[in-house]
């Protein structure tokens, strides 16, 4: 029986080719060297600015506050009381303006919103001042369509 043509010769040849390729790449690496010279960035500033890195948003397992806080400045806390002195009555009659003693931390927008909510009138403008006794006084000017005297009667201090 004649010997069959060997198919094992081809893998040896291909493995020899891969070995030659490996040897050539190794030669290239040896010629090039492992520690190649890299181009460095020239620093022109003496201060080192830390680079901005990725900051992921927090994903808490549970909320740290069990109950949300009640609103700290509601309409009833904003307006402490109406002012009904003689000069306040003159402002009501002449300038269509209501006077209130308000919370010291309330701002003009909060005062206007509180007047709108409690007395159903839209104020034209709000002026404030801090009195010498440390309380805040608000002058709430009403629109010409609304009479301040009627609102004062509705509040109940006339």
Swiss-Prot record:
Belongs to the universal ribosomal protein uL23 family. Gene3D superfamilies: 3.30.70.330. Residues 1-43 are annotated as: Disordered. One of its GO terms (molecular function) is rRNA binding. This protein binds to a specific region on the 26S rRNA. It comes from the Eukaryota. This is Large ribosomal subunit protein uL23. GO terms for cellular component: ribonucleoprotein complex; ribosome. Keywords: Ribonucleoprotein, Ribosomal protein, RNA-binding, rRNA-binding. NCBIfam families: PRK14548.1.
